Amino acid sequence: MILLRQPKQYIQTFLTSPSDNSQIVTATLYHAVPEQTNNDNLHTASMFEINPECPGSHRILAVSRDLEELGFTLGSVVRISQACEMNGIWYIEDRMNKRWKNKIDFLVNDKIKYGKWYNVKIEKIN
């Protein structure tokens, strides 16, 4: 499809608008520690048990509550793109504090300290 002579705003919207089963979000990292979770840092909101030796091996996502209202619910399988090394298949097993909007968190090992990505595409595949 060629979009010649279209307004720049239309082309930008066409290229970046999410489909019905996807959303564009901001993504950050979190660790399985009480400071970043609740007191039971080895269980997610869905009661999935986290391996304390290697929490990042599960590929677990936490989603903001507004995304849950859009169908990104606990137990969903999603594809992440536009997040560099975090791209791929992830499992929604946790939810974020209600103060966050349009945001996801990747559960990672404590060796990975920082990470933030903008315009990340989250696409529901199940």
Model-identified regions with their sequence ranges:
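Solvent-exposed, well-ordered loop and adjacent helix/strand elements within mature globular domains
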Residues: 5, 10-126
